[in-house]
Amino acid sequence: MIERGKFRSLTLINWNGFFARTFDLDELVTTLSGGNGAGKSTTMAAFVTALIPDLTLLHFRNTTEAGATSGSRDKGLHGKLKAGVCYSMLDTINSRHQRVVVGVRLQQVAGRDRKVDIKPFAIQGLPMSVLPTQLVTETLNERQARVLPLNELKDKLEAMEGVQFKQFNSITDYHSLMFDLGIIARRLRSASDRSKFYRLIEASLYGGISSAITRSLRDYLLPENSGVRKAFQDMEAALRENRMTLEAIRVTQSDRDLFKHLISEATNYVAADYMRHANERRVHLDKALEFRRELHTSRQQLAAEQYKHVDMARELAEHNGAEGDLEADYQAASDHLNLVQTALRQQEKIERYEADLDELQIRLEEQNEVVAEAIERQEENEARAEAAELEVDELKSQLADYQQALDVQQTRAIQYNQAVAALNRAKELCHLPDLTADSAAEWLETFQAKELEATEKMLSLEQKMSMAQTAHSQFEQAYQLVVAINGPLARNEAWDVARELLREGVDQRHLAEQVQPLRMRLSELEQRLREQQEAERLLADFCKRQGKNFDIDELEALHQELEARIASLSDSVSNAREERMALRQEQEQLQSRIQSLMQRAPVWLAAQNSLNQLSEQCGEEFSSSQDVTEYLQQLLEREREAIVERDEVGARKNAVDEEIERLSQPGGSEDQRLNALAERFGGVLLSEIYDDVSLEDAPYFSALYGPSRHAIVVPDLSQVTEHLEGLTDCPEDLYLIEGDPQSFDDSVFSVDELEKAVVVKIADRQWRYSRFPEVPLFGRAARESRIESLHAEREVLSERFATLSFDVQKTQRLHQAFSRFIGSHLAVAFESDPEAEIRQLNSRRVELERALSNHENDNQQQRIQFEQAKEGVTALNRILPRLNLLADDSLADRVDEIRERLDEAQEAARFVQQFGNQLAKLEPIVSVLQSDPEQFEQLKEDYAYSQQMQRDARQQAFALTEVVQRRAHFSYSDSAEMLSGNSDLNEKLRERLEQAEAERTRAREALRGHAAQLSQYNQVLASLKSSYDTKKELLNDLQRELQDIGVRADSGAEERARIRRDELHAQLSNNRSRRNQLEKALTFCEAEMDNLTRKLRKLERDYFEMREQVVTAKAGWCAVMRMVKDNGVERRLHRRELAYLSADDLRSMSDKALGALRLAVADNEHLRDVLRMSEDPKRPERKIQFFVAVYQHLRERIRQDIIRTDDPVEAIEQMEIELSRLTEELTSREQKLAISSRSVANIIRKTIQREQNRIRMLNQGLQNVSFGQVNSVRLNVNVRETHAMLLDVLSEQHEQHQDLFNSNRLTFSEALAKLYQRLNPQIDMGQRTPQTIGEELLDYRNYLEMEVEVNRGSDGWLRAESGALSTGEAIGTGMSILVMVVQSWEDESRRLRGKDISPCRLLFLDEAARLDARSIATLFELCERLQMQLIIAAPENISPEKGTTYKLVRKVFQNTEHVHVVGLRGFAPQLPETLPGSDEAPSQAS
C-alpha cells in the first residue's frame, strides 16, 4: 500500500519572537498551546505563508475579526516579521520517501505601505541529517548567529553534492512542483484554484461552516469532468475549426479571386509601367541619338542658309537701287502720257466748241430777225385789242347807266372830234388834203407799201453795211491772227509778216510729220539699248554666279559644256532615283516584315511562356510538338494510377474513421443500441464499470470477459425477462450479468491466469480460453490508446490522401494546361524566335537607313550641281541671242542722234499744234490784209438816211392806221341826236355792244396767239444767246488750258507715250517681281534661319535634356533593376509581350489597373498608402515597392495549413487544386465530428450518476462523525428541475429542436443555450452570451444542487447553518466538510499525478478551546482514519492525549522578546518525552 506523504517540520527564521525555531509536526495532530500572544497564530501564519505565498490572498486576522471584510493594515504579515531576511520552510517527505523542503524568503519593504517581499524556493535531495535551521543560519559564536540571504543560501546548497535548489518567479510553478511531489492535493493552475485552496485553509484555520465554501460546494467537491468537457471542447473546437476552415476555404476561394485580381492588376499596373519605362528608356536613347544627328544636320543647314542669305541680300540691294530709278522714269512717262491724253482731249473739245459756236452764231442772227417781226405784230395786236376792249367797256357802261351813256355819247363826240383831228393830222403828214375816213384805208395800203419799200431799202443798206462790216472784221481777224502768231506789229506790216508765217508754217508742218517715224526709230534703238543693258546685266550676274568672268567669245563653248554636264548629272540623278527606290523598297519590305514579326511576337511569347510554365511544372524540356503529345499520354497514365492509389487510401482512411467513431462512443460501447438497452433495463454497461481500468490491466480484463465484455450489468435478471420478449433491436449476442453496478467485481467467474492468457471456467463442463489481445479495447485507457494510435494512422493516411488528391488534381490541372496549350499555342510554340529575326532585320534596317542617308547626301550635292548647271544654261540661253547687241558699241551714239532730231521735230510739232489753227484761219483770209476798206463811213450815212425815211414812212402809215382805227369814231356824229332824246338809243347801244364784243374777242385771240409765239421766239433767242455765251467762255478756257499744258497733241503722241510707259512699267514690274521674290526668299531664308536657330536651340536643349534624362533614368533604372532582382520579381514584371504595345496603351493599361487596385486595396491601409506613394511618376521604384508589398501581403495571407508555398502565384494554382478537395473532406469530417443531442444527454447523465455514487461513498465516511448534538453529517445532491427537463428534451424530444442543432451558424454550445432559453423563458440570462451559457450547460456540475445536512438531536436531518448549530458543532461540521473536499480533490487529481504518490493531508484549527473533549477526540479519530495531519491552537487548559503538543510562552529578556517552546509527544499513557531542541536560545540580532 502506498504510504501517504507527511509534513515533517515547520521552520521559522527571524519571525517576531522566533529567530530560528523548527516545529516537528506530528503524523496526526500537532497542538500549539499557550496563552494569548504566545505566538500560536504567528506559527500558523508562517505555515500558511509557506504553503500559499500569494500576497493577494494572505490575510491573517484575529479570531475576533472573523467575518470582517478588512483587518489590520498589513493584513497581519508585516507585523509578524523582524527586520532583515526571514524564512518560513516546510520539511516534507512524500510517498516515494523523498525529502523536499519548500519555503519562502520574506523581507519587509521600507515604506508606509508596509509591504513584504516574498520569494518561494524548493530544496530537493537534502540529507535527512541536515536540519533546516542549519541551512539558513550561520553560527558566529556561542550566542550569536546570522541569517543567510537567499543568494548565499543558493551558493551553499549548490556546494552540497546531490542537493537541488530551485527559485521560483511564479507561484504557479511553485505549486506545480508541490503537486507533482505530493505536497498539496490539487494542481493549482490559476489564481482561482489558489483562491479555493486558500479559502479552504482559511476556513479550517478559523473554524466553523464557511459560507464561501458551502455556497460553491460543487466547485470544491465535484471534480471537473475534464475528459468529457475536453471532448466537448475538442468536438466544438474541431467543428469550429472545421467550420472556420470551411469558411477560410470560402474566404480563400474569394481570396483566390481577390489574389488573382490583385496579382493580375498589380502585375498589369507595375509590369505595364515597368515595360513602359524600359521602352521609354530605349526610345529616349534612340531620341538622344536622333537629336544628335538632327543637331549636326541643322548646323550644316544653318551655315548653308546663312551663305544663301548673304547672296540674296546683296542682290536685293541692287534691285532696290534700280527700282528707284525705274519708278522715277515710270512716273515721268505716266505723267507725260496723262498730259498728252489731256491735250488731245482739250484739242478735241476746242474743235467741237468752235463748230458749235459757228452754228449758234447763224441761228442767233436768224432768231433776232424773227423776234423783231414778232414784236411789231404783237404791238399792233395789242393796240387793236385795247381799242376793242375800250369800246366794249364803253358800250356796257352806256347800257348800264343811261346817264353814263350820255356821258359816253359825249365821250364819243369827243372821240369823233379826235378822229377828225387824226384825219387832219394824217392829211398833213401824208400831204393829202382830200383824205377822208373812207379813203384812209386805201391810202393806208399805199403808204404801207411805201413803208415796206423804205424798209426793204433800209434792209438792203443794212446788208451792205453788214458786208462792209464783215470785210472790216476779216481784216481785223486776220490782223489779230498775225498778232497772235507773231506778236504786236504795224497794220501795214501785217501782209508781209502773214506771208512769212505761212511759209514757216509749211516747213514746221513738214518737220512735225517726221515726229512719228523718228519716235519709232528712237523707240527701236532705245529697246535695243535696253536689251544690250539687260544682256550686260545678265552676263555680269552669270559671271557672278559662276564665280568667274567670261568673254563673249567663250559663252557658246561654256553653253555646250554646261549642257553636257546637265546630261551627265541627269543620268546620275536618274540612276540615283532608281537606286533610292530600290533601297526604299527594300526598307519597306523590311519594315513590313518587322511589323508582321512584331504582331506575331506576342503570340509566340505567350506560347513560350505557356511552354515554359509547362516545362517548370513537369520538369521536362520539349523540343517539338510530338514531345508534348507523348508527355500528355504519359500524364494520362500517371493520372489513372494516382486516382487508383488515392481511392485505396481513402477507403482505408474511412475504415479508420469508422473505428475511431466506434471507439469514441461514451461508456466504451461499440454499439449504440447497448446504451439504449442498458437504460431500458435499468442497468449499466460492463464497459462503463471497468471504464477506469488501467492500460496495463486492460488485456487481462478483456480476455477475462471475452465476448461478454459488452454485457449489461443489471441488479436483477428476473426483472429483465419481460423486456426480452419481442426484442429485435439488439446485437446478435446480448450478454446480461446480474450484480450491483456500485460494487461489482470479477468474482462471478472462476479464472486461472496463464502466460498472456486466461482460462475462464464458465460452468463445470464449459471452459473458455482467451489470450490477451495485442490491442486491448477494454477500458477507457485502452480505447484512448487505440484511438491515439488510430489518430496517428489517420493523420498519416489523411496526409497521404491529401498528397495523392493534390497530385491527382495537380495532374488533372497539368493535363488541362497541356490541352489548352495544344489548342492555343502548339501551332506557333515551336516556330523560330521572331525577336531574333527582328533584331537581325533591325540591324539591316539601320544599315539601309545609313546607306539611304549617304545616298541622299550625294544625291543632294548632284541635285545642287544639276540646278546650278540648269540655271547657267538658262542664263546663257537668255544671253546668247543678244551677243550682237553686246558687240554693238555705237548703239548709244545713234540713240543720242535720233533723240536730238526727235526733239527738233517735236518742237515743230508743238509749233504746229500751237499755231496750226491760226495759220489755217489766216491762210484763206490772208489776202484781206493787202488793203484796208475806206467806204465804210459813207455806207454808214446812207444807212442812217434810209432809216430816217423808213421812220417817216412808218409815221405816215401809223397816222393812216390811226385814222383807219378811228374810222368808227366818225360814226359818232349822231351822238348829239342821241342825247336829244332818240328813243331807240338803248337798242342801238345793244347792237353796237354785240359788235364790239365780237371784235374784242377776235382781237384777244389774235393777241394771245401772237404773244405765245413771241414768248417762244424770245425763249429760243435767250437759249441761243446763253448757249453761245457759255460755249464761248468754255472755248476760251479750253484754249487757255491747252496753252497751259504746253504739249502738242498730235495723232501719234499718245501711242508713243503709252509705249514708253508700258516699257518702263514692264521693267519696273520685272524689277519689283524679282525684288519681291528676293524679299520673300530672303524672308523665307530669315524665317528658315530663325526656325533653324530655334530648332538648333531646341535640339541642343532637347539633346542635353534627353542626355541628362537618359543619364538620370539610367541611375533610376539601375535602382529599379536592382530592386527587381533583389526581390526576384523580374520574371513577373519583364513581360516581353508588353514591349510591343505603345506607351499610350501601356499607360492606359496601367491606369485601368490603378483604378481597379484602388478599389481592391481600399480596406488595407498599408497597401493603400504604398499604392498612393507608387503613383508618383517620378519614382518608378515605388511601383516595384508596391508590387513587392503586394507579394509580401499575399504571402502573409497564404494559409499554410492549406497552401505550402511562399509564391502567391503558385499559391493561387495550389488553391484551385486544394480547395475542392478540402471542402469535400471537411464537410465529411464535420458530419463525423457532430455529436447528437441524445449522446450529450447520456454522457451528462452518466457523469451525474457516477458523481452521485462518489458522493454517496464520501457520505459513508462521514456517517460516524459526531460533534455535540450532531450525530451525523452528509451531502445531499439533487438534479435541478430546469436542467433535468433539458436532459429529457435532449434525449427524447430532440427531433423537435433540430433547427438549432443542424444550424451551421450555431455551435453545439450555442444551440444548447438556445434550447435552454426556449425551455425556460422565465429565466433571465443577463449579459452572458449563448456560448458562455452553453459551455456552462456542458458542465455536469451546473446540473446539480448540493447542500450540507446534519442529523442533530431530535430535529433529524436539517440544513447545516451556523445559526442552527453551536460553535463547536459548526467547527466540527465545517472540518468534516473540509476533509471531504480534500478527499475529493485527491480523487480528482489521482489521474493527473503519478500512481505511486499519495499527497499530504493537513488542516488547521485555531482557537480549538471552543471544542469539547469529545469533539476533539472525534477530530483525532477522523485524522487517524483519513491519515490526515492537523495543527490546532489552544489555550493552556487544552491537553490532548494523542499527538504532539507544543507549549509556547512569550518572554522578554534584556529588552529582547522571544518565545519559549516546550514540546511533548503522547503524554498518556506513555511518559512524556522531551523533543529535541525544545529549549531555544534567546534570539540575538545578527
Swiss-Prot record:
KW Zinc (keyword) present: no
Similarity-based family: Belongs to the SMC family. MukB subfamily.
Pfam families, alphabetized: MukB, MukB_hinge, SbcC_Walker_B
Coiled coil recorded as keyword: yes
Function as written in the Swiss-Prot or TrEMBL entry: Plays a central role in chromosome condensation, segregation and cell cycle progression. Functions as a homodimer, which is essential for chromosome partition. Involved in negative DNA supercoiling in vivo, and by this means organize and compact chromosomes. May achieve or facilitate chromosome segregation by condensation DNA from both sides of a centrally located replisome during cell division.
Protein name: Chromosome partition protein MukB
Region (Flexible hinge): 666-783
Binding-site list for ATP: G34, G35, N36, G37, A38, G39, K40, S41
Gene Ontology, cellular component aspect: cytoplasm; nucleoid
Coiled-coil regions listed in the entry: 326-418, 444-480, 509-603, 835-923, 977-1115, 1209-1266
Cell compartments where the protein resides: Cytoplasm, Nucleoid
GO molecular function, one term: ATP binding
An individual GO BP term: cell division
Residue stretches spanning the membrane: none
Keyword set, alphabetical order: ATP-binding, Cell cycle, Cell division, Chromosome partition, Coiled coil, Cytoplasm, DNA condensation, DNA-binding, Nucleotide-binding
Organism placement in taxonomy: Bacteria, Pseudomonadati, Pseudomonadota, Gammaproteobacteria, Enterobacterales
Domain notes: The hinge domain, which separates the large intramolecular coiled coil regions, allows the homodimerization, forming a V-shaped homodimer.
Subunit structure: Homodimerization via its hinge domain. Binds to DNA via its C-terminal region. Interacts, and probably forms a ternary complex, with MukE and MukF via its C-terminal region. The complex formation is stimulated by calcium or magnesium. Interacts with tubulin-related protein FtsZ.
Organism: Escherichia coli O17:K52:H18 (strain UMN026 / ExPEC)
